[in-house]
């Protein structure tokens, strides 16, 4: 190494001919490089932080979406189950109500006219369980719960022979008597021209009228 060149370690430069020369360019370049590295690192770090922040919210949003989808699916299943139960409950209630109405209608009720217990349930009026139709066998009357008493002829529901009047009875007896007392008469072989005694009373022989 040259004798006239001495390094000045304390000042960071070298001594030339009794003068200390500082390494300004080198120091400035290194400082600039160091500053540039720091700035670049500072620039890179925020970008990485932003990317990490973006990744974290993206992961959070994906997790939230998955949880929201699961909650929606659970709600749909609950609604379906609840809807099925709600749809099945009214049907069961209707069946129970109809069964109770039929059981109540099947019980014999006293007739509102004659108070007889000899009654029977016929059917539901207008297919309504609240209007059971009953029939009284004693007075032959139909009535509906909550309705008016229906008048039915006494002979309804029974097939009977029609009663005969006095003229019909007389005509019937006359036919029976004629059938019992009618006798065929034949002429006597000795007198072929002589009429039968049966016809003699009905058609008497006279001179004006030949036989």
From Swiss-Prot:
Give the ZnF (Dof-type) ranges: 109-163
Q: Which UniProt keywords apply?
A: DNA-binding, Metal-binding, Nucleus, Transcription, Transcription regulation, Zinc, Zinc-finger
Q: Map out region (Disordered) in residue numbers.
A: 37-101, 191-211
Ranges of Basic and acidic residues composition bias in the record: 68-80
User: A Gene Ontology MF term for this entry?
Assistant: DNA-binding transcription factor activity
Enumerate the InterPro entries for this protein.
Dof, Znf_Dof
GO CC: one term?
nucleus
PROSITE patterns cross-referenced by the UniProt entry = ZF_DOF_1 (PS01361), ZF_DOF_2 (PS50884)
Protein localization: Nucleus
> Which positions bind Zn(2+)?
111, 114, 136, 139
Q: Does the keyword Zinc apply?
A: yes
What this protein is reported to do is described as: Transcription factor that may transactivate seed storage protein genes in developing seeds.
UniProt protein name: Dof zinc finger protein 5
Q: Which organism is it from?
A: Oryza sativa subsp. japonica (Rice)
